[in-house]
């Protein structure tokens, strides 16, 4: 009887102890060195190894750190190395909308140069980020006989959804709005910490700032995923065809933004690449679910500290 009692108490202690433990995120703890890290393999790799490892993936999601020169140079080099392997390259970019596809085709068809392209696009109306960084990507695609595609929603259409201006929406836009999935809890956990600025903003509508801004994030991800699927159906025909999807890292990481919604529309295999910035005052830790690969870089500002 005593043995049974002891065993019973031990069992209770064991399971209650497990219940009290809080799971901590799993990370790869690394030395602060620039380079490419394969999260899938838990090891550093070089550019050629990265190119070889994406061979069987027709869709490649790339997370961008805006206004960061090094990450754009890395991606431009990646594009050029893929070109050397004879891949047919297509780049879908969040800085353009599908309505600009004809203009993008004229650019890649060499009907005008990059300077003229900048003037025609008037990208400053669409983004405040430095266009000279992303221009290297467009040039790399053009130089490798590739194609550029727009995939983002326009500011005007996004505003209708943000402000719930149903009277201004077409039937197609209303259908899009009604079918936004705002209930992916893991995605909310990822995004909400970045919406803290809502606490400081004046309440202008009955709806909370958090809810409105989160709906905008889901709108971006859903719209870009839908266009990624359309473009993929159009351009992925042979093992040599690649679709590179370039958007802000928060749209790509953890496979919870564009990739999640893309996977609901397409069975094409995909792989993801993101970035990790080295910071002087923090250990270098990469979340195991961040992406399949991470480009680790040190900014000029951090190096000078």
Model-found features: residue ranges?
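Zymogen propeptides
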Residues: 42-43, 47-84
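N- or domain-start disorder-to-order transition segments that initiate the globular core
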Residues: 4, 18-57
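Solvent-exposed loop/turn segments at secondary-structure junctions
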Residues: 65-68, 96-100, 154-158, 249-252, ...
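Short internal beta-strands
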Residues: 90-96, 272-275
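A substrate-binding/cap region within the structured catalytic cores of diverse enzymes
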Residues: 89-90, 101-231
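C-terminal regions of proteins
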Residues: 23-25, 138, 223-244, 249-305
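Bacterial N-terminal signal peptides
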Residues: 7-15
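Beta-strand elements within well-structured catalytic alpha/beta cores of enzymes
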Residues: 57-65, 90-91, 141, 242-247
């Amino acid at each position: 009887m005593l043995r049974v009692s002891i065993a019973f108490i031990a069992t209770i202690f064991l399971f209650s102890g497990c219940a009290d433990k809080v799971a901590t995120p799993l990370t790869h703890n690394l030395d602060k060195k620039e380079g490419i890290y394969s999260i899938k393999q838990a090891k550093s790799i070089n550019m050629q190894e990265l190119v070889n490892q994406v061979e069987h993936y027709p869709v490649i999601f790339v997370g961008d750190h805006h206004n960061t020169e090094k990450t754009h140079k890395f991606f431009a080099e990646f594009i050029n190395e893929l070109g050397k392997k004879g891949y047919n390259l297509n780049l879908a970019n969040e800085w353009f909308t599908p309505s600009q596809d004809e203009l993008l085709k004229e650019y890649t068809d060499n009907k005008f140069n990059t300077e003229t392209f900048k003037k025609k696009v008037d990208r400053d109306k669409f983004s405040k980020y430095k266009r000279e960084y992303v221009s290297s990507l467009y040039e790399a695609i053009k130089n490798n006989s590739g194609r550029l595609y727009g995939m983002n929603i326009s500011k005007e259409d996004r505003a209708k959804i943000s402000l719930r201006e149903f009277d201004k929406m077409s039937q197609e836009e209303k259908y899009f709005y009604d079918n936004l999935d705002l209930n992916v809890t893991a995605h909310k956990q990822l995004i909400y910490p970045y919406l803290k600025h809502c606490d400081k903003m004046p309440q202008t509508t009955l709806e909370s700032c958090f809810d409105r801004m989160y709906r905008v994030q889901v709108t971006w991800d859903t719209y870009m995923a839908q266009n990624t699927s359309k473009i993929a159906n159009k351009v992925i025909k042979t093992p040599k065809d690649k679709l590179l999807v370039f958007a802000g890292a928060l749209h790509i990481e953890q496979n919870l933004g564009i990739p999640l919604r893309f996977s609901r529309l397409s069975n094409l295999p995909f792989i993801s690449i993101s970035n990790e910035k080295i910071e002087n005052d923090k250990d270098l830790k990469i979340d195991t679910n961040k992406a399949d690969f991470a480009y680790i870089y040190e900014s000029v500002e951090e190096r000078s500290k």
